[in-house]
């Protein structure tokens, strides 16, 4: 990729923007060296890592980069077996902690989306928690070693503290004794030794060692002889403390050196992740999307925005290239946005090929090009004494020498700066030569000859930047398929140029040129109208899809409620049957107990008969229930993924496991996973019309009930028996309707009805808890019930 083109397209400014989102100098250095990658595979992988980081920012929030540093200098010293400073060790530990936490941050549950590229990067993390912990345990700050760093250090500092207390007690006593000889009744420290500020004329009155004097010489700082030994002991302890700290730092530094490969690897991964997440943060800030990358020269930028233009003012452009045509000629007035269009296309390609998401709509397509050449702006050099034309031609010669079918070439005002006739002819020749090579070209021009060339030549298409003649301002919108119209006469007229001058000018233009311009104007108007209609249709489609999605979600929610209600009802029915059977067995057990106690065996026989009748009747009810749900033969074999009918709940389910030795299988019913026996499974296609009809009717009835259920029931005016029946029926409907909380209005009155309702609620199967209403809810006139 040519460095000159990268500079012209201002990719360096994107790099500077990216640096603002990094946490470390090392990541900034990675961005400084960022350039388009050398293969389409690399581009896709680096785009994927950016996309994954972007998703993680949304789903998990900010990554764990707190306290991460650039530790390259510390690593370099550790490699040389040097002893590191406390601050350097702390920063290394912080980076190791960041690497470990990032591994935890990237982890996901089985049902969550995976992050393939980032997970592969994080697999290289060594994780050195022991070293990390030792450093944080031993060092508390940039220049502070913790007492707990070693038992020796702890003992030294404890002794040092005790000695200091002793010296301070002693010197305070001396201050009182020598107060008449001192400048001030205080003590101070000179060279780690406690001294007294003695007046120079009384130096003989305080025997001791002189350590310093004031700037005027009026005060001598004397260490009393009685403190010399104590001060010596303190000094010795301080030297021991220093030696122990040095030993601790040496040991920790040696551990870094012993694990230098892991430390360097973890640090490099953290810096790479810092760079990747800087790309993601940039994408989030600039509303970027991940484009589809191909290597076939196909470009489809949908509403691309130049990232260096103020987001409140930038006008999105849509550009296609490479399928129906490989060359695009853009015409239009000066300051109309032609050059911005070229730079937008070029810069978006450089961003995508450097692994950055692009400021464009979803589903945009970018092609990987080996080279992007840009001849944009006036690049003439005063030192080289080159004219505008010569400067452009120098660039073009270099482009012609290197461009091939895997190149994108951007020409701004091709052929300008010389005689229009010769310039147009030269431009057509250059374009045609590159087109035959298969080069993808976007060029801006003022020449009508190039408009005509694009109209005639297959594989070349016209485009124009829209201009509003009413306001005399460009709209900056790109219209593909329509050549730009010269607006010189209209602009001149609106600016006040007399009509007779404009009319005379028109007479000097050939009829063919006039008709050509009129044709272009007509095409522009039709194209603008068609694009407006297309935008309106797109907006209507989006609105329709939005409404459709909303109602589908509502329908799905109701379906889930229905499924859960059916499953709960069937499960409750089975529990009732099971409890009845257990009760019958309990009765029989009691009868046997009575018989052992001497009661008549005849009574036992009669109760045994009653039990058998009850059991037979319950079995009959259960069998009848299953049969009425669905007629058909039980399946003999099923496999994972089969869609079958679970007869007991009349519900289609998906088989999740093979039958075990008891014939039990795991199935998915709606959003629930339940265990069922293979005998309860039927072929999904085997349901007859009657059962289907029955199922539909039940479903409709349930949905109807769900729509009608209210959040409160009014019992005022009812007697106790009627109120209990009404509340019981209402709670069933509210429970099936999925209501979490309901209100029972019973009025205040004498309180009899309230007490009756509360007694009933105590043992109700649907009630989780209840309470009297609060102020604003109805007070003691209502009872608020929370359902299970």
From Swiss-Prot:
The protein's Enzyme Commission number: 3.1.-.-, 3.6.4.-
Signal peptide range: none
Keyword annotations: ATP-binding, DNA-binding, Endonuclease, Hydrolase, Nuclease, Nucleotide-binding, RNA-binding, rRNA-binding
Gene3D superfamilies in the cross-refs: 3.30.1370.110, P-loop containing nucleotide triphosphate hydrolases
Keyword DNA-binding: yes
A biological process term (GO) from this entry: negative regulation of DNA recombination
Residues annotated for ATP binding in this entry: 332-339
Entry's Gene Ontology molecular function annotations: ATP binding; ATP hydrolysis activity; ATP-dependent DNA damage sensor activity; endonuclease activity; mismatched DNA binding; ribosomal large subunit binding; rRNA binding
Domain Smr residues, every copy: 713-788
Keyword Ribosomal protein: no
Classification via SUPFAM superfamilies: DNA repair protein MutS, domain III (SSF48334), P-loop containing nucleoside triphosphate hydrolases (SSF52540), SMR domain-like (SSF160443)
Pfam families per UniProt: MSSS, MutS_V, Smr
InterPro entries: DNA_mismatch_repair_MutS_C (IPR000432), DNA_mismatch_repair_MutS_core (IPR007696), DNA_mismatch_repair_MutS_sf (IPR036187), MSSS (IPR046893), MutS (IPR045076), MutS2 (IPR005747), P-loop_NTPase (IPR027417), Smr_dom (IPR002625)
Domain of life of the source: Bacteria
Family classification: Belongs to the DNA mismatch repair MutS family. MutS2 subfamily.
SUBUNIT field: Homodimer. Binds to stalled ribosomes, contacting rRNA.
Task performed by this protein: Endonuclease that is involved in the suppression of homologous recombination and thus may have a key role in the control of bacterial genetic diversity. Acts as a ribosome collision sensor, splitting the ribosome into its 2 subunits. Detects stalled/collided 70S ribosomes which it binds and splits by an ATP-hydrolysis driven conformational change. Acts upstream of the ribosome quality control system (RQC), a ribosome-associated complex that mediates the extraction of incompletely synthesized nascent chains from stalled ribosomes and their subsequent degradation. Probably generates substrates for RQC.
Protein name, UniProt field: Endonuclease MutS2
Gene from which the chain derives: mutS2
């Amino acid at each position: 990729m040519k460095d000159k083109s990268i500079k012209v397209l201002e990719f360096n400014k994107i790099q500077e923007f990216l640096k603002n989102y990094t946490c470390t100098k090392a990541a900034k250095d990675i961005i400084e060296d960022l350039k388009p990658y050398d293969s389409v595979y690399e581009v896709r992988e680096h785009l994927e890592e950016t996309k994954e980081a972007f998703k993680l920012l949304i789903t998990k929030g900010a990554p764990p980069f707190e306290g991460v540093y650039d530790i390259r200098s510390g690593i370099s010293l550790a490699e040389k077996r040097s002893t590191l400073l406390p601050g350097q060790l702390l920063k290394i530990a912080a980076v190791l902690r960041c690497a470990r936490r990032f591994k935890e941050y990237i982890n996901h549950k089985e049902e969550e989306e995976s992050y393939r590229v980032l997970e592969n990067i994080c697999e290289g993390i060594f994780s050195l928690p022991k070293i990390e912990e030792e450093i944080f345990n031993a060092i508390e700050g940039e220049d502070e070693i913790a007492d707990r760093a070693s038992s020796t250090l702890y003992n030294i500092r404890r002794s040092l503290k005790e000695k200091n207390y002793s010296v301070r007690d002693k010197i305070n006593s001396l201050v009182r004794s020598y107060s008449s000889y001192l400048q001030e009744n205080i003590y101070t420290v000179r060279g780690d030794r406690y001294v007294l500020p003695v007046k120079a004329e009384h130096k003989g009155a305080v025997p001791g060692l002189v350590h310093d004097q004031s700037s005027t010489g009026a005060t001598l700082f004397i260490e009393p002889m009685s403190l010399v030994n104590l001060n010596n002991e303190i000094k010795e302890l301080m030297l021991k403390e220093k030696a122990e700290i040095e030993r601790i730092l040496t040991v920790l530094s040696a551990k870094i050196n012993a694990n230098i490969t892991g430390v360097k690897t973890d640090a490099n991964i953290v810096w790479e992740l810092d760079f990747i997440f800087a790309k993601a943060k940039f994408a989030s800030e600039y509303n970027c999307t991940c484009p589809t990358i191909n290597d076939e020269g196909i470009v489809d930028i949908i509403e691309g925005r130049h990232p260096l233009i103020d987001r409140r003012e930038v006008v999105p452009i849509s550009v296609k290239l490479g399928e129906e045509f490989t060359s695009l000629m853009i015409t239009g007035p000066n300051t109309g946005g032609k050059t911005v269009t070229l730079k937008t296309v070029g810069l978006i390609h450089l961003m995508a090929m450097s692994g950055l998401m692009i400021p464009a709509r979803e589903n945009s397509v970018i092609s990987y090009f080996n080279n992007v050449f840009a001849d944009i702006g006036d690049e003439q050099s005063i030192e080289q004494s080159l004219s505008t034309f010569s400067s452009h031609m120098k660039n073009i010669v270099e482009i012609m020498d290197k461009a091939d079918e895997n190149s994108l070439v951007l020409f701004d005002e091709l052929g300008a700066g010389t005689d229009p006739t010769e310039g147009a002819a030269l431009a057509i020749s250059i374009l045609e030569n590159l087109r035959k090579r298969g080069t993808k070209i976007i060029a801006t021009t003022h020449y009508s000859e190039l408009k005509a060339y694009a109209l005639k030549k297959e594989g070349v298409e016209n485009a124009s930047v829209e201009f509003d003649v009413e306001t005399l301002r460009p709209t900056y919108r790109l219209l593909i398929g329509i050549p730009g119209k010269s607006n010189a006469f209209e602009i001149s007229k609106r600016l006040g140029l007399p009509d007779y001058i404009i009319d005379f000018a028109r007479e000097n233009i050939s009829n063919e040129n006039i008709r050509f311009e009129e044709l272009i104007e007509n095409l522009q108007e039709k194209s603008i109208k068609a694009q407006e209609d297309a935008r309106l249709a797109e907006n209507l489609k989006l609105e329709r899809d939005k409404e459709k999605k909303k109602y589908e979600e509502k329908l799905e929610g109701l379906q889930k409620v229905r499924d859960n209600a059916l499953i709960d009802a069937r499960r409750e029915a089975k529990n009732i049957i099971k409890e009845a059977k257990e009760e019958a067995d309990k009765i029989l057990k009691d009868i046997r107990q009575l018989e052992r106690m001497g009661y008549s065996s005849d009574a036992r026989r009669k109760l045994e008969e009653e039990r058998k009748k009850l059991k037979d009747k319950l079995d009959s009810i259960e069998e009848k229930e299953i049969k009425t749900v669905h007629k058909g033969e039980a399946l003999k074999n099923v496999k994972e993924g089969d869609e079958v009918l679970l007869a007991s709940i009349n519900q289609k389910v998906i088989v999740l496991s093979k039958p075990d030795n008891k014939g039990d299988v795991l199935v998915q019913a709606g959003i629930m996973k339940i265990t069922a026996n293979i005998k309860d499974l039927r072929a999904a296609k085997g349901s007859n019309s009657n059962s289907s009809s029955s199922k539909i009717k039940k479903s409709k009835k349930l949905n109807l009930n769900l729509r009608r259920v209210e959040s409160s029931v009014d019992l005022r005016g009812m007697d106790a028996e009627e109120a209990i029946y009404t509340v019981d029926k209402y709670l069933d409907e509210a429970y099936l309707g999925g209501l979490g909380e309901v209100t029972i209005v019973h009025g205040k009155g004498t309180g009899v009805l309230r007490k009756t309702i509360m007694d009933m609620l105590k043992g109700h199967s649907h009630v989780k808890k209840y309470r009297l209403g609060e102020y604003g809810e109805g007070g003691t006139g209502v009872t608020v019930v929370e359902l299970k």
